[in-house]
Amino acid sequence: MNWITNYVRPRINSMLGRREVPENLWIKCPETGEMVFHKDLEGNKWVIPASGYHMKMPAKARLADLFDNGEFESLPQPKVAQDPLKFRDSKKYSDRLRDSRLKTEQEDTILAGVGKVQGLKLVAVVHEFNFIGGSLGMAAGEAIVKAFERATAEKCPLVMFPASGGARMQEGILSLMQLPRTTVAVDMLKESGQPYIVVLTNPTTGGVTASYAMLGDIHLAEPGAEIGFAGKRVIEQTLREKLPEGFQTSEYLLEHGMVDMVVKRHDIPETLARLLKILTKKPVSAANDMNSGAIALAASA
């Protein structure tokens, strides 16, 4: 009896017992409720296959997808003071930084790299939204400035992929200082004659929208991205009136002249390459003639 109780029963229980399933094994589409296996979602560039809804894409995956063969040089993360204000709300800021670093395996919200897109050298800067909402703090601001300096020094274009809730409140005025700093960095690149293209992703809001995210020579946007300064609910409460359907979406901003093109994620590398070749006066291939007219129009606008 002891043999059955002590050996056989535990073995059966272990075989039939419930196994732990990772929380992110299946991803639910916010738009349609469709459940997608996470590997299928990653393989489709974080776009829901049936609905075409663009999920937030990790910064590392974004850079690997953008550059030819996924090859690029990562720019080093600048060292800045950690938690200079000793800020605490419901949680210590230092603890938030630690947790975000464990979650994303990044030092801060910005990842930057140098590589080639269809043979054209450029610097790309990407926000990681899962790092404290992609917020702009001292480390992020310094990383952005360094990326612009690198692009200026190497005389190559810079492409920005913002995804942010705005300035990082835990750093107070030190965070707000990054708005003029990054704006000056944009001007520095433009004075050197190099193109600056912004690909607006979901969401792009707050102080990021009020600075470098809306200073590009050309603005692309992913479908359905929320783009604005204050949130829709805040504006409605302030104005005490209902805002139009689709307000602050990529498509709404395209209709009202705030962005130049809405581009699906799968088409972004090709579109960027063609735009940059036009802007830098390099030969453009005859392929994809259907898109060339729209791209040339955007470049001349």
From Swiss-Prot:
EC number: 2.1.3.15
Keywords from the named record: ATP-binding, Cytoplasm, Fatty acid biosynthesis, Fatty acid metabolism, Lipid biosynthesis, Lipid metabolism, Nucleotide-binding, Transferase
Pathway: Lipid metabolism; malonyl-CoA biosynthesis; malonyl-CoA from acetyl-CoA: step 1/1
InterPro entries reported for this sequence: AcCoA_carboxyl_beta, Acetyl_CoA_COase_Trfase_b_su, ClpP/crotonase-like_dom_sf, COA_CT_N
Entry keyword annotation includes Lipid metabolism: yes
GO aspect biological process, one term: malonyl-CoA biosynthetic process
Gene Ontology MF, one: carboxyl- or carbamoyltransferase activity
GO cellular component: acetate CoA-transferase complex
Family, per entry: Belongs to the AccD/PCCB family.
Entry function: Component of the acetyl coenzyme A carboxylase (ACC) complex. Biotin carboxylase (BC) catalyzes the carboxylation of biotin on its carrier protein (BCCP) and then the CO(2) group is transferred by the transcarboxylase to acetyl-CoA to form malonyl-CoA.
NCBIfam families: accD
Protein name: Acetyl-coenzyme A carboxylase carboxyl transferase subunit beta
